[in-house]
Swiss-Prot record:
InterPro entries associated with the record: RNaseH-like_sf, RNaseH_sf, X-over_junc_endoDNase_Mg_BS, X-over_junc_endoDNase_RuvC
Binding residues annotated for Mg(2+) 1, in chain numbering: 17, 148
Name of the gene this protein is made from: ruvC
UniProt protein name: Crossover junction endodeoxyribonuclease RuvC
A GO MF label: DNA binding
Family matches, as Pfam families: RuvC (PF02075)
Residues that hold Mg(2+) 2 according to the record: 76
Entries under HAMAP family matching the protein: RuvC
E.C. code: 3.1.21.10
Amino acid sequence: MFALFIWSFMAIILGIDPGSRVTGYGIIRQTGRTLEYLGSGAIRTQVEDLPTRLKRIYAGVTEIITQFRPDMFAIEEVFLAKNPNSALKLGQARGTAIVAAVNQNLPVFEYAARLVKQTVTGSGSADKVQVQDMVTRILRLSDKPQADAADALAIAITHAHTIQHSLQVATSAKSTENHEKTTALLRTRYSRGRFRLKI
């Protein structure tokens, strides 16, 4: 029964690569072990004042959620930047995107950039071109997505792989005394908002 559940599991995942001027987004559908590309692009905020940029990011993310109705929201974690001002603006853009997701009752998951690269390319130090190439292969795309969109899709793919791993752990734990704890953890992690995980 657990193996059947893994194969029938389905969710739409929205990945976000935050930026104060360009915020990439990517949407995939996970059905069991299969990933399907639904859409991607970038929210561009070519204005000077930060408050207006944040407003546009919020509106853009909200519009994407309304259009694609994802079950989960995955976003890149803040990383240390050499320029403190740039890091601050990135953090504000990231926070704005998260608020947009939370206001739509989406569960939010965060991933370090190095983990995303490692998951998609096999190397935590991969460059943007390598990420683009692997995202194109994994999702069987005819054309490479733009860099920011590819990064967002990579984040969504990383979350899909995390779900798959969690379900495999639950499967192996079924016949053990840890099964109840494992399934409770999965419900806690994946059963917020509109999405429901049935085990």
